[in-house]
Amino acid sequence: MCIDACIYVNDDVVYSYKCKNVWRGKFDATKVSAFEVDYEYESGYGNYDLMCTCATQMVSARHGPSNSRKKRAARELR
């Protein structure tokens, strides 16, 4: 079943999409300057790079699970 998932910065939606699974987490921009969000579409995988622009902002992400191992395995098969 597909669900809506969003990435928020200071409670504003900066990206939304449909994904199969949900993972919830918060990222403190005072400790990281950027991070990559991996998510799983109904039809495949993708990622979204989010740069933290303000040292005081809290970034929360609700997105698909990390699929690094799956993507790495798929690349190795090519």
From Swiss-Prot:
Name under which the protein is recorded: Host range factor 1 homolog
Native source species: Orgyia pseudotsugata multicapsid polyhedrosis virus (OpMNPV)
Classification lineage: Viruses, Viruses incertae sedis, Naldaviricetes, Lefavirales, Baculoviridae
The encoding gene: HRF-1
